[in-house]
Amino acid sequence: MDWENCSSLTDFFLLGITNNPEMKVTLFAVFLAVYIINFSANLGMIVLIRMDYQLHTPMYFFLSHLSFCDLCYSTATGPKMLVDLLAKNKSIPFYGCALQFLVFCIFADSECLLLSVMAFDRYKAIINPLLYTVNMSSRVCYLLLTGVYLVGIADALIHMTLAFRLCFCGSNEINHFFCDIPPLLLLSRSDTQVNELVLFTVFGFIELSTISGVFISYCYIILSVLEIHSAEGRFKALSTCTSHLSAVAIFQGTLLFMYFRPSSSYSLDQDKMTSLFYTLVVPMLNPLIYSLRNKDVKEALKKLKNKILF
């Protein structure tokens, strides 16, 4: 690429979800409601865990950070997408685009790894409940959490640096509602083979590590549960895992479909619909899954409700 003839763009133009004027108002109302529920539910989960002493355990410590990740990466994309549905000017500054991608990637990657850490936490709780608080001390929890965020930051910086040093000298229209890597690579006039290789390798490593961690943890959990003689004991042990497994299945399933399907079947329109699901819908579902299926969270909500009313 001749870099001297490659002019630097000052901004990008996000084409958004649809160009149909009749659908825009309806989609705005629907996604605004989804985002408000998402924001309120995740913020509420964080506040509830901080306020209720009974929820000051490793499991809920990690759950509060799962809600924090959901809140951050959905907020990185949601408000801009909502504004663009009604605004005439859908531009985003070049560095604003880079920042949006950076924040989104940090917290999406962190959530991916955090789900694996939460599986490890469930393994420690079930395999040896008497030593659970010792094995999962505050120091261990913070070390695991620090590792999660450091990997998320490192991965995001690698992809951002490689993507935003490419040459964008043609169209500045991104066929998406936020600055994601695949549509940016399609827009670039540079050779993107290195970017694609790094994206596949690094993201593949994170996905493989996460899925392997969850799989190994639950193999040990199942073996441990099988040693419990009473049906009630088995049910109690597994009941704490169902919410986590639901969250893993929804999040990982969406990501695998998004980034690991054959290039021959790749469609930007399909990509946008899938992105909408995991940037807005999945973050909304996580706190609902954990609150509706978790006895401790239900009890904490009842106590908070009684405090407010009385």
Curated annotation (Swiss-Prot):
Which CDD domains does the protein's record reference? 7tmA_OR5C1-like
Q: Name one GO molecular function term.
A: G protein-coupled receptor activity
Subcellular location per the Swiss-Prot or TrEMBL entry = Cell membrane
Residues passing through the membrane, by range: 26-46, 55-75, 100-120, 140-160, 197-217, 238-258, 272-292
Q: How does it sit in the membrane?
A: Multi-pass membrane protein
Signal sequence, renumbered to the chain: none
Positions in the Cytoplasmic compartment: 47-54, 121-139, 218-237, 293-310
- An example Gene Ontology CC term for this record: plasma membrane
Task: Cite the InterPro entries for this sequence.
Answer: GPCR_Rhodpsn, GPCR_Rhodpsn_7TM, Olfact_rcpt
Report keywords, A-Z.
Answer: Cell membrane, G-protein coupled receptor, Glycoprotein, Membrane, Olfaction, Receptor, Sensory transduction, Transducer, Transmembrane, Transmembrane helix
PANTHER family the UniProt entry points to: OLFACTORY RECEPTOR
Quote the protein name from its UniProt record.
Olfactory receptor 5W2
Can you name the source organism?
Homo sapiens (Human)
